[in-house]
Each structure stands twice: as C-alpha cells, then as structure tokens.
C-alpha cells in the first residue's frame, strides 16, 4: 500500500495571496496564516467536508502585505513580518499586537523563533539579518559587509540546539549558515543559478534544502557545509518544508506541489488543484478572481503529526491535504 495525499477541504477568508502558514507543535486544532491582504488569521479547524476550518480571529495592524508568520512553541503568540518594514508579536488569546519590532529599513520577508522562543530572527530587502529579543530590542545586525549582497528572502533557526545555528537564503543565489552564539558566518553554500526564495531545515537539523528561480532544490549537509544532491522541481520554487515524521521534502512550485521521498529521491506526489471540481464541492466559491486564472501554491506547512499538509495559494484559499493509502 502506497501513501499519498488527498484533498480534504479548503479554508476561505483571505482575499489575497496566502504568504505563510504556521502550525502548532502540540498538533491542536488551530493554524495561523498571513496574507497580502495585510491580515493574519487564527483558524479553528473543524475538519468538515465543505470547509476544513473557520476564521476565528483576524489580526490587523500592518500597513502593507504580511509576508511571514510563525508561532511560539507554547502556541500563545504569533510573530509576523511585513512589507511595512516591521515585525509584530500578537497575543492569540486577545488578537492584540503586543509588540512592534522596528529597525529594518525595507520590507521584512521572513521571521523565525528560536526553539526556546527567547530569540527572534528576521530577514529583509534591506539586505540585513537582525537578531532580536522578545522585548523588541535588536541585539545584532548582520549587514551586507559580512552577509548577503542582495535581498535576504528567508531565515530559519536550526532545531538542533546543540549547535545553535541560523540559516539564511538570498537573492544573491547563496545560502549562508551562521553561528547563533556570535553571529559569525560558518559557511556559504553556493550552487544555485538564480535568486532564492526559501530555505528549510530538516527536523533533526542535519540537512537544509534551498530553492527559488532556477527550479532546482539543492540539499546540503549543514554540519559539513557540503552539497549532497539536487532535485528537479521544474519551475520556480516558492516554499519548501520537510515532513516531521517521514523522509519527505515538499516543494510549492508554480506548476504543482511536489513531494519527494529523500531516500529513493523519487517523486511521491505531484498535487494539482482542480478548480472546477472544487467549485462544485464548495457551492461555487473559488476565492478571488475568475475561474480561468492560473493559481499556484505559495506557502506550505505540515501539521505536527505529519498527517495533514496545509497549502496556501495565490487565490487566497488554503487547501488541506491528508495522508491516504491506496
């Protein structure tokens, strides 16, 4: 019996592209999403056929597109980054913005929490990476002189707490690996022929995967700083994520969501959306725009148990895929 993914349902409330999806570590029935509609939504998952979840709270305050959102490990706070140049911390119980992080001079493209939630990292079009504490104080800035020569599109902490590490991806076509303790560069990973949109670190912190314009995913050994192998995605990659419990890597591309088994390096799934079938199932509501519009996935995240894949699209709809056997 092979494992595959089937469309379980959709979630509609955003009115523009879904830029990021955050799932809780305790696998509770909520997710948080960000969008170009300038809002962040806290969803309650109902897991019903027509609508997989309902918008419980919409958080507004950013004055431009919200590009990224992540959750604290206790699930009480969301952290967002926006093209307005700011980060915000949100109390999910009240929906209030409790803190603003001001310092970047251009759009914030990516944010992350350290595993203990005590540190925050952000990446920006101003070509810097900033390290903050939760009080909103910037503790360190990695500037262009030491760092990336172009926009920094994505930044992530490694889950490996024994070797505290930050990984960043940039439009300068490189991935950089930083020592978190002193913010010094450990490795520069070069090999892409186009700008990078995304980098993901494996659950054990041993690997990272990067992707962007050239449509090729490169897998790297983080400890050694070496390229391991490449996977052909075939079109621009917008988001990458590792499964929490299977040796799978997922890519959101402009053609489909493609999933590889990293042991065999074979494609397990190639998920495409059937808008016509979807419209029939959901009484004709297909998000924004007309039905002939080409839509694609821009954000991805697994549930903590690895059984559900949440995918956010350019039409503002979140499509939910579940593991099935056939």
From Swiss-Prot:
It comes from the Eukaryota. WD repeats lie at residues 13-53, 61-100, 103-142, 147-188, 191-230, 232-270, 290-326. InterPro entries: G-protein_beta_WD-40_rep, RACK1-like, WD40/YVTN_repeat-like_dom_sf, WD40_repeat_CS, WD40_repeat_dom_sf, WD40_rpt. GO terms for biological process: cellular response to abscisic acid stimulus; positive regulation of signal transduction; regulation of translation; ribosome biogenesis; root development; seed germination; shoot system development. Coiled coil: none annotated. SMART domains: WD40. Widely expressed. Signal peptide: none annotated. Homodimer and heterodimer with RACK1A or RACK1B. Interacts with GB1, MEKK1, MKK4, MKK5, MPK3 and MPK6, but not with GPA1 or MPK4. Belongs to the WD repeat G protein beta family. Ribosomal protein RACK1 subfamily. PANTHER family: RECEPTOR FOR ACTIVATED PROTEIN KINASE C RACK1. This is Small ribosomal subunit protein RACK1y. The lineage of its organism: Eukaryota, Viridiplantae, Streptophyta, Embryophyta, Tracheophyta.
